[in-house]
Amino acid sequence: MKKMLPESKVEAIRKEGFLNRAVEAYRFFYPTVSNVSNFKALNDLGITENHDFIIQLTTPDLNVLTQNSDTPYCLGTGNTENGPVVIELPQGAIVGVADDINFKFITNMGLTGDEQGKGAKYLYLPPNYDGDIPDGYIVRKPSSYRFLICLR
């Protein structure tokens, strides 16, 4: 017959499980919380989703996750809750990325994107979209409705 663990050992294992879950939740949600703060900051500056972009001039005293301190950035947000969104990128020496609300990579854009700097129309579809997809677009389907576009 097997013996039960002492209550103190059971409690220690339970506490360790709670701690592990808390660390896991923190690591999972940290990028999401960080990106939601980007959306809030852009909204506070008057940027309208699916419509406006802002040019951010960075300096060494600006403390921002993953940005270079001497590079100007063009930032905007998209939201596919009301249907597909098109981002038209002009030809040129542009390097960019789109990330979903959880800061998970969607696509590269510009020189590192599928169009390799030749310019293109990116079509962002809502999750679970099952409608027609027109020709002539680079199609992306983020896992969330909201996404961030960062160009430089």
Q: What does each model-found stretch correspond to?
A:
Residues 1-152:
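A compositional/structural signature for long, glycine/proline-rich flexible linkers
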